Structures are given as structure tokens and as C-alpha cells.
Swiss-Prot record:
It comes from the Eukaryota. This is Histone transcription regulator 3 homolog. Residues 823-835, 1865-1897, 1915-1934, 1950-2001 have a biased composition (Acidic residues). Disulfide bonds: none annotated. Residues 361-378, 1791-1800, 1847-1864, 1898-1908 have a biased composition (Basic and acidic residues). One of its GO terms (molecular function) is nucleosome binding. The gene is HIR3. It comes from Gibberella zeae (strain ATCC MYA-4620 / CBS 123657 / FGSC 9075 / NRRL 31084 / PH-1). Belongs to the HIR3 family. Keywords: Chromosome partition, Nucleus, Transcription, Transcription regulation. Residues 264-300, 357-445, 791-845, 1757-2020 are annotated as: Disordered. The keyword Transcription applies. Residues 389-400, 1757-1773 have a biased composition (Polar residues). One of its GO terms (cellular component) is nucleus. Its main location: nucleus.
Amino acid sequence: MPAFQAINLEPEDNIDEQIDTTKEIHVDEALKRFQHALKLHAQGPRSREAAEAAYNELFESEIFKYREAKTDYERAERYADGQPEVSNLDPSLTDGGLDVDAGGADGVAASLAQALYLSYKNYGQFFVDKFKDASTSDTAWKEKAQLKYHDDGRKVLDSWMTALDQDPSDPELWRKAARFAGAINSNRIKRYCLEAAIELDDDPAVMELDPPSLAEGMAGEQLKDQLKLLGDDMALSHPIMAPWLKKKMPALLKRHLDPIPFLPDPTKSLIPPKVSDTQAQTQEDTEMGDADNASLTEPKSVSSWAELGAKLINCLETTAEAFDTCDGIVESSLEDVPIETPPNEIESVASEIEVAVTKPTETEKSPEKDSTPKEQKAGSEGTEDSQKTADQSQKDSNGASARKRSQSAAGLPDGAEEENAMEKRSKRVRRRETLQAEETTDPNTLIANQLQPYQGADQNLFQMTKSVLEHLGVEDKSTFAFITELIDSCATENRPGKITNLAACDLSSVIVNFREEVAKVFLHKNEQASLGPSSFLEHAKTGSQDQPSMPSFNEKQGLRSFARKIGGCRSWMTAEDVAYEWVRAVSQSYATAKWSDKMKLSVVQMLNKVDSTLYRKITEEMELAAGSAERLADLETIVPMLFELHVDIYELITNPSSVVDYATRMDTKYRLGRWLDIASAYLRLIDRPANDPLIARFLWASVLVSSHAEQPLREHILLMWTSLRDHLADEKVPAISLPNNVVMPTISPAAADREISKLTTMDFFLGLFQDNMDDPVFVIDTLEPVLNPSTVCAPNQGTDSESGEDSDSSASSDTTGASTLDSSDDSTDDNDESSDASSNQKQKKSISDCASQSLKDLWKFLHNSSTELRLFLWSRLGDAYDAINYSTKKFSCCLKSIELIVSDLEGETYANTVPESRRLLFMRTLKSLDELLITALGSALNDNTAFEIIDDAHIRSTSAALAKVNCLLHVASLCEDEVRIGIKPERTGNAASKAAFQALKNKLKEMQIRAWCLQYTMFKAGINKDNCIIGPENDLADYLAAIHQVIGIRKFCKASNKIFLKVMRVELLKLKNIENWEDYLGQVLYDLHGLKLGAGVWEVQDHACPPEKLEKRQTMQLVERVCILANRMPMKDLLKSDLKTTIDHMQQTIGQTKSTPQMYHNLRNFTEYLKKPIHPLRLYRALIGDVSVDAVSVNTPETILATHGWFFLLGMMALTKFKGVELNRRQTPGATDDLRIGATFLRLQLQFTADRWDAWFRLAECFDYELDEAVLWTADKMNKERPELVKFQRNAIHCYTLALSHSRNLDIETHDGDPLHDLYHKFAMRMYASSREPFAMEPFQHSDQERYFIEDMGIGTFKRILHSQMNKYKVWKFAAKLFRMAMDRKPDNWKNPYMLSKCYWKMYQTPDDQLDVKDITSKIGLMTLIDTLKKAVEVAHNARRGRNTDPIFEPHYKIVTILHKLVIRGDVPAKDAAEILSEQPFGLEVNPDDHFASFSALEDWEEYIIRNLSKLKEKDKANWQHRIIIRHAKILFDEATEVSSEDRLVNAKAAFGVLRDSMFTKTMVMNVWKCDAERPGRHHVYTEQYVRLMTKLLVIMNDRGNLEQLLRRLRKKGADFYHFTDLWQSCCMAYLKLLRQGYNVSPVADDAFKALSSEEFEVVGERIADWAASDGAENPLFNCMKEAIEFKKLNANLMKVAPIDDLLYDCYSRIYSEIAKTLPGPDPSKVVEERHHAKEVAAQLEAAQTETKVTSSLASILNAPNGQESITGTATPMETEKQEAAPRSRKTGVRRPDVLRKAEQAVIRALEAPKPNKSRVGSVSSGKRGSRTPNQRASDAGSEEDGPDSQIRREAGHDGDVDMKDAGDENEEDHGEEEHDEENEDEQDEEHDEAAEDENAEEHGVEEKADSETGSIEDSADDESDLSDVPEDYDEEVPPGLRFSNLGHQSEESSGEDADSESEGDDEAEESDGEEEAEEEAEGEETLGIEDTELADEDEDEDEEQPKRSGSWAANDSIRAVGW
């Protein structure tokens, strides 16, 4: 949640309020109607009818359709039944989340509840009032003992029940309901209502409470009376009854105890009402109670003809049982009540018949077999009954829960209400909360929400399928009907139940009622039996194609009359006679109605059981009926039936698949023969005409009997069928249908033709079934005309088709010899046929038009044959085509087979199959379909020629068939959805069953995947520009996406080895110009490989697909699309997106690119090109696109990657990652590794595509950024490694040149910024920056690249540079051109006009003598310059983002400074310049009252300019714009202006004041920050300029103290200043000048020591040193010398020390001249003589004692008193000789180094004189320090001058400490070593160490204590952080013990020899550790920016955590020292 919320924002209108308003309207309307009804109701009996009409109108209001209008009980009952709650509300309201209780207790919900409550309450009262009217008008009313519920009593109770449901807290209404319940004699309801009336909110089990209202008190009294009447003492003991038992109701109130006194109340007494009333009551109870009791008590009886037949078969031996059965039927009342037999009640009747015939004598087992279906039915019925019972119990429990009373009814405390015991809420409020809880957990809503994604996806897919089929021209209505069913099912929850397609229903049944044996048919790969000749006839059965629909046999009709008839003949009939009569009765319906399978089975079993009886009875009847037509007519139905059924039975048991034994067959054959004779005799007796149906039936059956002879002649059978056909046709016998006979279901000429065709085509099929038929051409020629006649043409010649047995062979020969594939249908539309082909086509016609009769017979036969047979034929044809490598025709055969299967699943044969057998057939067919889908899909995907001969008609038919297949298979998904969501429970069973069920589901999912893939391939082949919806490619992509969504959300798109995902990936990569392909491809890649593209509108969904490893081949295919996506996104966003991860993964898969010779060649050319000097002409040629670099083409697999810009993309990603932090705002150096990686990929891109401009541009950027990194953070490389910087600049300029040249003729897209603008701008910036400091035109200078040229005259050569160098003016001119081009593309970028104005100004200032003729003529004018400046100011001011943002100062400052310079130059009058400035946004207006308004003098203009600068400075609140400050100072102090020394001093002080206020602190710390728009490297240039200016000002002001502090700061920050060495030298010279001036030390002309010998000088030097230790501090000359020595230590040999030594020499010389003679002591010459004398004596003594070998003892005695030699130590004889020899060799006097040595010794002696603390000698001689300083080299003296210096160092080391350390340690030695010769190394090292030590000692003396040898490392902030001064006496007195606190730390970092140039920051940080610590403690008063303080705080925190700082800390300190 946000921490605050705006209070001034008005909330938007809430849609819920609109919904509530709609509800309020409904409530208001209902209340108006209620008031109208109530008004009429109150008018009494005269308005009863009007009131009733008003109430009816009231209950038609909208509020009574709301869910709230239903009672708890109704909702519970509906939920228990699984019925969704119906609401007539607007779907938009309910979908929007309608809150029924919106508005709270007093809102709409409360009004709605009140309206419902009042309506129902008064409606019930209305009927009570009608009873009251009747009681007064009807005299018989008082005689009524009770009311009837089904009269108006039901309306009263129902209305009041609904009202109490709305408000159960109305005790008065409860009393009325109880009273009315008593009127209808319901004690139970009465008691319940009274208990509800007195049930309190507070539980009486906790505390005893009185009834809160009078109504509740009366209810309690009534309940007490009722309980006493019933004698229920247990209920009376309940605590709630206590108030009524303890207290007595007054008689006054008891009169009002009965709320409805005019109604009867039979419950007042336990005596029941009258008998008539009792009967009525019983009837009422029966009506109100369960109706199932009657059915439970009635016994099961025979209720159908089939059951009667089965019963008679069982009681053939017991006649009495047969009659008892008939008697039971007579007594039964169920006749003519239809009972539907379940479709899956019994097994196939054929198998039952076969069993019945096989064992005719086993009477004991027959009843069991017969009863099996009954038992199954009984079992199923029992299951259903148990299920119903369970459902009923569930309903009862729900109802009970809805009527459940509170726990107080049982005397138990209600724990849920204990917390609310103090707060009593109304029942209505609690009721509302219960409603809310129910609505939030409504299961129907949850189910609907879960179903919605599946429904939406399905609707989209099938609607799209329908649309595509319509556009393709499909006209199959059944296809669209099936698809429409599926689409319509998306609007319901019970989706599978809405599908009516029979095959789909079968699939649903297979899944829902799963049986493992059924699934095995589909799952197991059992080899099918090969189709042979014997099975041919079985597959060629006629079937029921022509059989008309017959009415079903009513198995109860006439059953009772038959039973009554049999019962009347009980005296003479036997059981066999009853059986005969039963057969005779059922024979009446044999030819007129369709028997059920159970009935057919009963008839066949009866024929088998009583065959002999039937034969005997029929024979007797025929004999008796001879001559009597009437009696013969009685046998008209039974005789033909018996004969025909025996034919049917014999056919069944003799088919090839029958397993009936031979004996049974022979017995059946014998019976058939007998019945043939009977039928023949009967027909002769009746003597009917030839066209009589009985004659036709007999002839047909006779032919069938003849065809089943032992060795029938085929020709004879054929002739018989032909004769029969002719007879039927000639006699015009109408078609006869025998619905109960399988073998002869239809008798007609057409059926006879089918039989004939079966015989005539037998040879044809017998040939096909031969296994040795290996000639594929013969198979094709044979089968193609039969299976696919539309594609076969016959030659237009010929021969008449023959008939008879030769017709088949002739037709075969014709088709074999002349049949060809119909090219007219299969040829493509794009190719035109030649005239010859056209003429040849005219000679042909379709085989359908000239087919022989045998061929037609084949077609007829196949039309009626089984699916397996036709599939087998198509398979043989496909195999034949495959054998001749005609794959496209094999593919066509597969498609035709699929169409065949789909057609047969919709055929009548399939529909008429028995359900159980149909499911098995369906699973077998599904298995065949799956195999065909696999074969067809493999061809469609892998064979490019698969669709070559597939014409449009073929595509339409196959697409329609596949659409049906997909609809069919989708039913499996619908069933699984129901289980997944929870509509249906998961099936239970053992592990094997579950495994089989899961295998079935997986197999179906795989089939769905394959079917959808094949459907897509068909659509792809059929869709073109003429029949597409949007566009061919868009249609296909959308269709793939729709399929993916449907199978993806169901988590099975991974099925079938992810074939669909792979197909979709390949197809999406092929399709171009499609919409939303990012979403489509992104989801596919995520499913396949787990990759996310991060683009598109949709989020990828988890489809539960395990990712596969991405291969290089697949990656190469994806590169194009990934590059397109990456190029669409801004590069910064790309680095944060999922696409970046995908790109990295792809690059890992691709791996490193191997270089080829061509790539090496290109790279070598590029490298050589970048080394070339910059040719001016090449730059200008680039503007017209005429510059390129030589490269050869590269052909490798990776070339395609470069073509799509893959390597450029990788390079841009690395480059953008480096640029992620803006260069100007970065606080640490960038990760140059990313920069180099980016450059590597860009070079790789250019090796493939050398003409890619953006690659050259970005490579130039890489060089630019590398250059910026080199100069941004430190000035080291600018000062030391300039060749590397020049290389970067040249590389960048060359790359920019090529980028500019290649981009001139291209149309550049600007989706991610404007790269072309960036090219122009950055190229111009590079050119301009290279022309200015610190680069100073060096990239354009190539004097080092000279070559020899041959002279024009002569044979000599001369050396010259390659071409003329580019001057500054040309560079500025070229840059200006680029800036103008950039302005054209981005006019709102202020930097372009700003930099253009700078270029113009530089060009404007250039003298004409430096320009060529062309440049002079086109020189920049003054107005152009000023207009450009104005433009820059305008654009920059408009670019400001808001008032609270800082303005862009650079253009404002630039126009001020340039106008000032123009005024100073005299080019622009001051007034005009002031007018221009006043027009600017930040300009200062000139008022006439201003004293400078006249601008008569230069001072007026300067004052005006200074005021302008001050205004800009005020705007710059962050103090970033240091150029404004320095410009102000330079205006005050103009170096170019000649003024007097006094004025110069005043100007200098004014300028110093400006700088001191804003730029320099009191301790001379310079605070200069790098501005955002400042070019990298310029900061160091500015700091150098500012230091030089400050130095000049301090020199003029003679401010030596500030200059000394400035030098200290400058010395520590050497890496921050451009030209630091020169800057340091100039500042040092200025400081030395001030020293001489301050102490009046002039150069000494004469050598003051020329008269002294060295020995005498030593004596004098000792005296001067002693003097310096005592009285030297008071002498100015000595102070000057001391400061000079300290300065020399600070210098640390960075500058040559000669000027410092000169000052020391001059100071010491003057001290000698002025002081030495005044010092006490003997003459120096005498002292020298005494010393010589002592040495001589010592030498003599030594020589005398040589013989005694006591040299050492004598030496100790002689040297002991020589205290003056303690400095140099005890002399050895060799040293003595050397010392004696020295005076003799040096006669010239005192040398200069000796003087300097003595001067330093005197200063050291003076510094160590007071020793308040421990001696500093120990500090200097620390072993740790000595081990870390380069003093080892001191022994290697390089020259004669090193001797005295070394002596000075030794003396300093023994006698005292150095005084100052400021310069750092090792890196300072680097400077010294670079500037001086190696002979001075010893002196440099020692002086450096001394200086460093003394500086830290001074700086740490006040604020720190030396904690350890490593010193303090808490460099928490820089000098730049605070601007306060240190105490005045800070540097005067430093405790010696603190002077070396940082000594160990300073020396352990690195050695001067090994220090890298890039580690300057480390050295600077180390140098500043001591001094800055102390300064920061005191400098707490003034700050210039917030960043320093923040940095300081951060560093302090880090210091506390890390007591020892690493090198990187020093680097950070160095960065902060720059001024960040």
C-alpha cells in the first residue's frame, strides 16, 4: 500500500454503483406493485379478485427471478441435484461481479429482502383472508375438522415459508404458520414453527432469559401447551422453556393466544378426526409423500412377450407353471405401459442364437442363459436404484442441513457465538452473511470459471475450422453440423452430453464407462487375420442398406388378452400348446415390426426347443385346413416365418467364422429341409398369384437354400438370382422388408442385383486375395477403376461391354490395357496444356461413362461391403503405388481411406449395429484410423511431392473428413475436462485398469495431435489468395495458434513426440508477414526448449512440456526471427528481457565461429585501413557515399547469421551493457570487458558484411568509449601514453567515415532512437573533440608517416608525408556540416545547435591568413553565429522537462561568453550585445535607470556581463557550472589587458575572492565537478587552467601561504591535471619567486666560500648548525632556507632541483656572510691545524705500536677524545689515509653540494633541538621501514657529487627526522626517475622518503595518534568534501611521535619501480591518508555540493567495516578527488 493517498483526486464512477442502481429500480418497481396489491387487499372481499391479479403481477417482477428470491431449501436441493442456479439477470451484470449485498444492511440488499419478505407474507395472509371470507359466508365451514393441503393451504404455507426464509426473526409470523399447520393437522410443522418463534439469539444454556417480545411469549405459551398435550417432558425440561414453566400467562393475554381463531385446529386433541377425514388425510399424505413405496411392495412379474417366451421355455414340462404365468399377466395392470429396453441390455443376438442352436437339448442350462440378460438388467437396475437411494439420502441430508436448528435446541452452548455474546445481532443480518458466504463459494461459478478457458479455446479453433472449410468450398452439411454442435457445446457445462454424433457418443461412452477389454482392441497391436476368400463372403454381406425403418415391436401390446385366452383353455391345453400359440401370436408381428434382440432370441430359442411340436401342429393344421381358405389364412404368418427364420439360422451357423460343430449343422440342415417342404406345400395349397409377397418370399428363401447346397454351381446360382430379379421386376412385386431376418432383410430387384454382383465379383476378389500377386502395375490397373473411377479414363474406342461370366474379364482387360490417371483433375492450374494434349484429352472419357456391367457390379458390391474389405483394397492399391515409387498416389490412397472410415462411421450399418458390438467395431475402426493418420502425416510432412496430384476436390473431401475426425477425437478431451475440473470424479479401479485407461487417453491424445497436424497440411495445400480469410499466411498461422491453444491448455501438446510443436515451429519460421507471430513462436519455443522470447502481447503458458536441448541447426533457423524481435526492442529493454537470456543460450549453442582464409583477409584489410592517416579528401568523399574498404565475400554456415545481423546484435548487447550507466553519471570506470567483447563481435560481423554501416558506427563507438574511459578518470594516459589515445581516435574516425559513407544511400529505420542522427552527432563530436585539448589535433597529424618520392627533375628522391594534414578550420567545418545534418534529423536535441555554435565560433575567430581561398569566401558570418547561438538557447530552454528540473546551462553560458568576446573584439557593440542577451530566457534586461545602461565604457559592459553570469550562477543551485565562475574571475582579472600594478593587484584580489567563494576552499582545495555535457578529458584541462590562473593570482597578491597549500594539494593529485609536470614546474617556480621576494633573497654573485678549505667549511658548518638550533628561528634567511628545504622534499625530484638548490645556496651563503663571523669560537684554520696535528700524532703512535700487535687498542685510545668525528664514525687507518689525502687533492675550496649538505644539516639540527618526546631516531631506523624503502641502492654511487649527498642522508638518518611528507612514496619516485638521470637515484629515493615521512608527521600530528606501524587508513573523505579551514597553528608544531603514523602503510603499497601508470589513484589516496584526515576534522563549515558529503559518509561506513584498505579504495579516493 502507498504511504500516502492524494486527497485532491476525485474517484471515478464505480460500475458497481450502476449495477446497484439497476437493482434499486427493480426493487422500487416491485414495491410499487406491492403497495398497489396491498391497497386492493385491504379493501376487503369485494376486491379479492383484483387483489389476486395485483399479487400475480407483483410476482412477475424482476426481483422474484433473483437468486435471493429462492429459499435455502430450494438452493440446497438444486445443488444436490447438480443443477445450476438459473438467474434471469443480465449476463453483463453477473459477469461484472454483481454484489447482491451492495450497500450494506440499509442498502439495496436490505430493501430487496424486505420487499421479498413483505410480498410473500401478505400473499399468504391474502389466502387466509379468503378462508375468513368463506368462514363467514359458507355454512358448512364450521363442520370442517381440518383443511386440505392441496387446496389453498399449500399457497399459505409456501408463501409464509418463503417470507420466513427472508426474515426468520418475525415470531408473529411463526405463530401464524404454526396455527395454520395445526389447521391442516400437521403436529410436526406446528411444533417446528413454535420452536423457531421462541429461539433466542442468546443461548439459554448459558444464561436464563425472558422472552424479549409479546409474540415470542405467546408462542412459548402455545408450545408449552402443545408439549404438555403430547406429554413430551424431555422437551419441557429444556432451559429455553423455563420462563413459561415458572410463570403463568394472564388470562387477559390468553384470549389473544390464537392468532387465527376461525380456522379449525385438530391438533388441539390427540383424538383423530372423522373416518372420512382420515381417508382424505391418508390420500393427502400419499400425495405429499414418497411415491416409491408402491413399486417397492409390488412383486416382479412377466411384462413382455419376450419374457413370456423365456418363461414358457422354462416350463415346457410343467403346464401348471405356464398357466400360473398367464394368470399373473392377467392380474397385472402394466399392459400397454411402454418400458424401454436399455441399449446395452444384452449381448449380440447373433451369438445368442448360435448358442441356442448349438445346444438344443440342454434344457437345464437354457433357463440360465435366458435369465442372464435378466440378471444383468436386474443388476443394472439394482445399481441404479442404489444410486437413486444414495442421491435421495444426499438430498435428505442437504434438506436436513438446511432445516438444522441451532445447538441451543439440544441445550448445548453455541461456541461460535460466544465471542458475540455481548453484541446481539438480528437474524436478518446473520442471514445476509450466510448468503454472502454461499455466493463466494458457489461451485457452479467456480466450475464455469474453470471451464471458460477451455470453452473459449475450443470455440475459437472450431469456428476457425468451419470458416476455412467454408472458404475452401466444402459443402458437406454433416461436417458443418458436427462442428456447429461442438461450437454450441462451448456455452454449456455438460459439453459431452450435447454431442449427438453417434461415433462421438460411442467414444464418450468408452471413456466414461471404461472397460479394459474394449480398450485392448484399440491399444494392443494384434495382427489382424488376413482377408481370404472365405472371409470375402462374410465381409460382402448385403446388410440392411435398403431396409426401411420399421416400427419397434410393442412387447406388451396384446399380452393380457393372450394370457386371458390361454387361461380360458386351461382345461385342454398343454405347455407345448401354449408355446405353439405363443409362436403363432408373435408371428403376426414378424414382417411388420422390428423385434428387440431379446425378443428375437426368445423366438429362436423357442423354435429350437419346440421344433417337433411346431412341425406336428403345422402339419395337422394344414391337413385340417385343406380346402378351407380361411383356415389356411390363419397359417399365413407362421409358416413363412418358420421357414425364413430357419434359413436365417442356417446361414448364421454355416458362415466361415462360425464354430458350430458338424452334427448341429446337419441337424439344422435337416430341419431347414423339412420346413422348406412345409412352406412349399402351403403355397401350393393357398394358390396365390405370381406377384404375391408370399411367393416372392418363398422364392428368395428357396434360392438361399439352394446356394447353401454342398457343391452349388456358381453359374446355376447366378442364373437363379437373375431369374428371381427378373421375376420381381417383371411382376412388379413391391419391395418386401423383413426386419427380423438378417440373411434376407429386404426382397427387391435391387437386393437381387446385390446378390448377383456378389457372385459376379467373386473372381475379381479371389484374385486380389492371392498372396503371389506381386505385379504392382496389375494391381493398380485392377483396383484403380474399382476404387477410384473418377481418376481413370478409358479410350474412346471400342467394344461393347459383354455380359455374363466374361464381362468381368473383359472389363478388367479394358481397364488394364487402357486406363490412365485422369490428368485433368490432378494437374495444376498454373500450367497450360498443349494442343496435342488437348486433342488427346478429347479422345478420352471417364471410365464411369463406359463401364461394363461387371465393373458396375463391383461398384455396387463395394458400396455395400464392409469397411475392413474396402480398407484392405485401398491398402493394396497404396502398396502397389509405393512399389513403383509413386508416393503422392499412395498418400492419396491413405486420404481416401480416412474418408472411407469417416463415411462408414456415419453410415446406417454402423448406426444399426448393436451398441456393445458397435463399440468394439468403433475401437477397431479407430485403430485403423490411427494407422492411416500416421502414414498420411509422415507423407505430408516428409515428402515434398505428396500434394502433387491432390486436386481441390480431393482437398475439400479430405479436409471435411479430417474435420469430423478432429471433432470426434475432441470428445475425449471434453470428457477429460470434466474430470480435470471436478464435474465428474476420477475413475477408480486397480492398477492395471488405471494403466489401461491412461494408455487409452494417451493414445487418443496422440491421435488428436496427428489429426490436427494432417488437417493443417490439408489447409496449407488448399488455402490460396482467392479463398483465404485474411491472408494465406495469416490464416495458417492463426490456425496453428488456435490448435496450440486447445491442446496446450490441456497439457498434451507434447504428445506424439512433440510432432505438432515441431511442425508449428518449422511452419512459423517459413511463414512471412503474419501478425502475432511473436506470441505464436514464443509459446512454441517455450514448450520445445524452455526459451522465452519476451515479446508479444500474451504471456507464455506452462503446457507441462519437458524442454529439449537446442541444437545448432535449429538455432540457425531461429536467428532471423530472434534478430527481428531484438531489433524491435530498445536495446536497454532487451538487456532486461527474457529475449536476452534466449540469445545467450542460442549463442552458446552456436559456439565460436571458426575463421576462414577469407575472414582473415578481410580482418587484415580492416586493420591496415585503421592504421592509415586521416585523409581530408576521404572524409568529404564519405559525405557522398564514396568510401569503402576492400573485402571478399565469405561463404560459411555462419554467413546466414551475419546476413541477419546476429553478430551485430551480440555486439550491440555487449556495448549497450557497457553503456547501461550513462558515461557522465558513472562514478567508477566502466567494465571495459563488455566493450571489448562488443568490438569483437562487431569486427566479426564486418568480416562477413563489410558494407554494414551500423556495424562500422557501433565499432566506432567502441573506440570512442575506450578513449573516453582512458581520459575520464585520470590524466595519466593523456600525460604519458598519448600514442594509444591517438590510435583510438584514428580508429574511431575511420570507422565513423565508413559508417557515414555506407549510410548515405540507405533508408534508415528509427524504431530504437535515430541511429543515423547518433552517427552524425557522435562523428562530429569526435572531430571537434580531437581538435581541442587534451587531444590537440594529434589524430590529424601524421608527420611520422613519411615516404620517399621521386623528384620531377633528376633521379633523386625526397621524403615527404603522404598527403597534407587536416588543419583545425577544416576539422571544424566538417564537424559543423555533420552537426547540421544531425539537426535536420533531431531538431529538438540542444547539443547539436550548441556544438554547431562552438564550431562556428572557432571558425569565426580563425585568422584569414590561416585559411585557403575557398574557406575565406565561405567564412562564417557574425549573424550566422549569433543566430545559431540563439537557436541553441531556444532548443535547450524548450528541452527542460519541468520547473523543478535543473535547466541546461551550457547554451546560456556560451552565448554570454561569445557575445562578451565579440564586444571585447569590437565586432559587436555593447548595446546590441546587451539587447541580444536580454532577449534570452536567463538574460538580464537593461533598464534605463541602470548606471551601465549607456555602455559608454568597457566597465559598463563588464558589469552587465558579470550580472548575467551571476544570474546564471544563481540558477545553478548544484554548483556544477564551474565555467561560469572562472569566466567571472577572468573578466575581473584579464591577463591580456595592460594595467598598472596597483590595478592589477586589485583585479587579482577580486578574482581571487570570486574563486575563493565558489571554487577554492580556505585550505586551497579545488572543488570542480564534471558537468553532464562536458567532454571526457576536458575536466583535466580545466583543472590545469584553473590552477595556473590561481597561481598567477597568488603571485600577484604575494600570498605565499595559500600558494604553499595549493602546491601541497597539487602534488598529491598529479593524475588529475593535464600536463602535470609542466604545471608543477611553473607553480614551483612561482613559489620560489615568492620565497625570494618574501625573504628578500637575491642571487649571490660572488662565491662566499672560495677562501675556505673543506676542513674549515666543516668547522663553520658545525657552528652554523649549532646556531640554527638555538637562534636560527629568528633569522629570515634561515626561515627561507628551511622553507626551501621543505619545498624540496615536497617536490621529491618531480621538478629538477636546480632552482631550489640555488635558493638554498644563496640563503646559506648569506648566512655565512652575515652570521658566521659573529659566532663564538677559534678561527677555523686553527681548528683545522689542531686536527691535522692530532692525526699526525695518532699516525705516529700507530706506526710505533705495529710491532706489538695492539693496533685496535691504540686506535681506540687515539680516537676516543675526537668527539667531532662522531658524525662519520671511528676512522680506520685506510680511512685516515684517505682523509689525509683529500685536502692535498682538493685545493679549489668548498663545493656546491657541500654547501647544500650543510644547509640541510642546519635545518635538521634546528628541527630536532627541542626533544620533548622520545627520540625520532628510533622512528627513522625502524627495521620495518628500512626493509620497505629502496635505500639499498644508496651504496651504488653514480658520480662524484653523490658522496656529499650520501653523507647528508646518513647524517639525517642518525641525527634527526625529516620534517615533511606530502608527495607519496613509490609513484613519486617514478616521476623523479623519469625526469633525472640514474646517477641521482640515491638522492631521489632518500629525499622522497624523507619528504613523505615529514608530511604525514605534520598532517597527523593534531588529530591522530599512531595506532600501529601501518598507520591510519581511515581516509573517509577527500579534501573536496568540506571547505572549512584548518586551525591557524596546525602546521606550526607537530608532536614528533605522530609524524610517521602512516609510514608503514605508505611504504607497503608498491614500489616505485613496479608502479603502473594506471595506479596513480592508489598513490594519490595513500598520499592523502594523513593530511586529509586532519583537514576534514576542521573543514566542516562550508560545502559546495551534496555528493561529497554522501561519498564521505559512505566511505566512513566502509572504513568502520574494513580496518585495512585495499588498493581499490585508493582508486575510489582518487576518483572523488577529481571532484565527483
